[in-house]
């Protein structure tokens, strides 16, 4: 367990005779980037649980927002700290609508936006506005989350602006997940971009971890369904399900699979 690991770590430190002191202001500033990345990682694990029956691990997402707020309290003028807090606030504001009452995940196109926490969204947008001039990784991610949160309906989503922010994000943080997000955003810009997305997603698969590949295939399933290719969508969905341990996601994939099977008849 985590408690046992902490106990062993404390015992090892005690045996070593090492002494640790609280870092000074300059040292803390130098470590800020690593701290923000760690908090983001914690939030990501909470946003979609690695395993279990629930889509969300609220313990981890709650811890992440607590840590992000404490960092902003320490560094109120740091645009990346503000961006990370904005990103988490906006995500949490939409959290209650991400599943049905029985825990079935919903897409952004399906959610009831009236359930979103509007006060929290306003706070997140204010933080994002302060962060965006910095042009950093978390600031740009907050901008993307802000555009999603500002759309009154799915149809009103500004995919052009979101695609532009993803392009900027790929320049400062060219991670596979950013490339994936950019492809998904562009796929909503018209039929030619939708066809292009199908090709790009297949090219992207296999470039990172098994967990990431499952996300790629889930996106590909959506793209192929929108293209009217139910058979290809079903194949992609099967690949997305392979090795998935989050039971809520598996229930969602089963629901989509049933829908595809009905359409293919």
Question: Model-predicted segments: where are they?
Answer:
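Alpha-helical solenoid scaffolds that mediate protein-protein interactions
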Residues: 64, 71, 93, 131, ...
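"A position-specific structural signal for the A-helix of alpha-solenoid helical repeats
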Residues: 84, 88-91, 141, 145, ...
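Alpha-helical adaptor scaffolds
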Residues: 108-114, 133, 137-218
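Amphipathic helix-loop-helix modules that constitute alpha-helical solenoid scaffolds
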Residues: 3-167
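Short, solvent-exposed positions on alpha-helices
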Residues: 4, 79-80, 177, 231, ...
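TPR/TPR-like alpha-solenoid repeats
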Residues: 88, 95, 149-151, 185-189, ...
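C-terminal non-catalytic interaction modules
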Residues: 206-265
């Amino acid at each position: 367990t985590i408690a046992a690991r902490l106990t062993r770590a404390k015992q090892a430190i005690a045996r070593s005779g090492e002494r640790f002191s609280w870092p000074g202001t300059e040292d803390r500033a130098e470590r800020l980037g690593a701290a923000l990345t760690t908090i983001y990682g914690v939030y990501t694990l909470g946003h979609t649980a690695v395993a279990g029956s629930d889509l969300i691990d609220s313990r981890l997402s709650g811890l992440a927002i607590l840590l992000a707020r404490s960092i902003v309290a320490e560094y109120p003028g740091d645009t990346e700290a503000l961006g990370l807090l904005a990103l988490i606030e906006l995500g949490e504001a939409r959290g209650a609508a991400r599943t049905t009452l029985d825990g079935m995940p919903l897409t952004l196109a399906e959610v009831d936006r009236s359930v979103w926490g509007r006060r929290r969204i306003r706070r997140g947008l204010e933080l994002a506005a302060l962060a965006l001039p910095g042009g950093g990784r978390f600031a740009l991610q907050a901008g993307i989350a802000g555009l999603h949160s500002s759309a009154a309906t799915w149809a009103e989503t500004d995919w052009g602006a979101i695609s532009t922010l993803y392009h900027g994000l790929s320049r400062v943080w060219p991670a596979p997940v950013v490339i994936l997000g950019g492809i998904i955003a562009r796929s909503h810009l018209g039929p030619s971009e939708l066809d292009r997305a199908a090709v790009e997603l297949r090219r992207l698969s296999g470039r990172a971890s098994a967990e990431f590949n499952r996300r790629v295939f889930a996106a590909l399933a959506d793209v192929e369904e929108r293209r009217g290719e139910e058979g290809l969508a079903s194949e992609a969905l099967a690949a997305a399900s392979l090795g998935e341990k989050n039971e809520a996601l598996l229930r969602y994939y089963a629901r989509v699979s049933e829908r595809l099977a009905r359409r293919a008849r």
